[in-house]
């Protein structure tokens, strides 16, 4: 949703292949997340030791979701900078949603990776997403202040 809502700000109405690819992949990830989680639960219910690969597969969609959200946070900078000011609220919503996606994915990733002692730098991902979010927020605030003077 966040990836598509930021398009409301676009002045040129041009294709953003990067956003299109992110959006398409996110749709696929929804089903992968469900499928891999179901496979993990099915294995767990057998009462035997669950192979590490099931945990890793269950974590992968959320891990990719984090990467795609970070990529989108970086990509929307130019849209926030140059997009329609009358649609800035859409940019604010997209910026905030993308950061929350990164934060909210972490518990699921942790639940799936902790049993197999697989390392993942949760703090690094969140910190980088916050950095991009803050940069975008500064652009938004600057544009809103500029609007006040017009």
Regions found by a protein language model. Give the residues of each.
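Conserved, well-structured ligand/cofactor-binding cores
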Residues: 1-150
